[in-house]
């Protein structure tokens, strides 16, 4: 008997690297999207931490009035933020090498652009990595589709809105009070609370929270009893066990009697699809709303829409909101312009008799 031994070609270094990158046996899956995700998110995180602690004030409005955002310049965790790139820069790509010095780059808010653009690349790659791992494991792709909702929301406030408004200085500041400031100014300029897509987003987030709490509490409550009536049902289970611990038929029966029969799911797959789709679709709509308001297609305006027979305005809640919007608008960027845009746009009365 003759044995033929074939010498196996040793795999190249590149081949071993590719196998390691795409291996599903690693403790944390890397993947080709991860090759870009890891450096971009590390960069965004590192610069965020350094800038939040030590960045000097930024001339956000481009009028030589720097605004302090870092901890070392007098802020705390609540008031601190990464101040958006200066209006003097607008939408220009502003890496460090485009500035005359690092001091100039910091003064004009260069770190904001650096953080935001790396962050958006990173989270987009994280979404791609979710799809890639699902593909390698033979799973369906809906995890990445669900994650597209927060990715779209982040892209809307950090990229699409500044593009529509013409400057990164209009992007959302990276901090707690900065986020609230962004929301208040957004309401003042775009009447977002009266936009149907924002309403759908509110229904998505609040409804998703409600459905998540209902589902979790119902599953936890409808245990398959493994004990006698005289001891706690909890004694029949150990945390993380593989065996099924709840009965969907019992849960369906409970909920069907609590509300009505057809308000309850008796199919686990359709139930979980609903739990995923409701908040995702809501947040998609909100991101779409921000992206349309970026180009000044604003919320509904019912101001002074109710009048009496003499043509006198009967104030409604729309007029109250309008008055609040004007108040918020005159308070922000108070030194950048003399009047809010709504007032400045009104035609001056004729004075020639």
UniProtKB/Swiss-Prot annotation:
Phosphothreonine found at: 2
- What are the recorded GO MF terms, alphabetically? chlorophyll binding; electron transporter, transferring electrons within the cyclic electron transport pathway of photosynthesis activity; iron ion binding; oxidoreductase activity, acting on diphenols and related substances as donors, oxygen as acceptor; oxygen evolving activity
Q: Which domain of life is it from?
A: Eukaryota
Can you cite an annotated GO cellular component? chloroplast thylakoid membrane
Q: Which UniProt keywords apply?
A: Acetylation, Calcium, Chlorophyll, Chloroplast, Chromophore, Electron transport, Herbicide resistance, Iron, Magnesium, Manganese, Membrane, Metal-binding, Oxidoreductase, Phosphoprotein, Photosynthesis, Photosystem II, Plastid, Thylakoid, Transmembrane, Transmembrane helix, Transport
The record's account of how the chain is modified after translation: Tyr-161 forms a radical intermediate that is referred to as redox-active TyrZ, YZ or Y-Z. C-terminally processed by CTPA; processing is essential to allow assembly of the oxygen-evolving complex and thus photosynthetic growth.
EC assignment: the record states 1.10.3.9
Q: Which residues bind chlorophyll a ChlzD1?
A: 118
User: Transmembrane residues, as ranges?
Assistant: 29-46, 118-133, 142-156, 197-218, 274-288
Q: Which residues bind chlorophyll a PD1?
A: 198
This protein's name: Photosystem II protein D1
Task: Please give the organism.
Answer: Panax ginseng
